[in-house]
């Protein structure tokens, strides 16, 4: 969280006028008794007279409490007007990673984690392990893959244009959360709100890029930097 706040004050205030994030609708699916599914429709709009570009992964959401050096859409949850200082309320899948803390056997824990990750990425466990082995054993491969992944996440919006996305998020209906030393219990009848944000970075992500790709990005004048926030919208976390 501190990183996000520092980056916010570092960026020029005019940056907020370049990119607008708007939550359009949130659709609820209660067909699963263990999870509540939210489909969030949101729009990114270039409000300037020229093309803008930025690193962004639209199909992955993360809690804003996890830090800002990432390309995911960040979200914050509020109860009434109070920011909830907790992580793990919403996730990109139904996988419950909190259960891993109860698995004492390291080998069993890694098998369970691999299965969860493979399911999320829609790949086989063997493919996941092979990829991980290459990354950990070959620094050049890691740098190449990291740069390739980041460059493929570039979003470009022409002048005065917009693009709409949909993202599914899941809530496991738990009300007690603990993040570091923070404990929180979600009120059963309180109104809750979600707010989305993008931290558009450039030089700050140079460590993930090859020297050639970083040079390309550095010389691209359409790349924007800034902290962009959406409207707050009601999200149903009631009992």
Q: What is the role of each PLM region?
A:
Residues 1-23, 42:
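Bacterial Sec-dependent N-terminal signal peptides
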Residues 34-41:
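Short, solvent-exposed loop/turn segments enriched in Ser/Thr/Gly
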Residues 17-34, 235:
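Low-complexity, acidic Ser/Thr/Pro/Gly-rich terminal tails and inter-domain linkers that flank the onset
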Residues 48, 56-58, 169, 198:
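A mature extracytoplasmic/lumenal domain signature
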Residues 136-144, 155, 166, 171-237:
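Terminal connector regions
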Residues 55-83, 88-94, 120-144:
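Short acidic, flexible loop segments centered on an aromatic residue
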Residues 30, 42-51:
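Asparagine-centered strand-capping/turn motif at beta-strand->loop junctions
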Residues 84-119, 123-126, 140-179:
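Intrinsically disordered, low-complexity Pro/Gly/Ser/Thr-rich segments with frequent PxxP/GP/PP motifs
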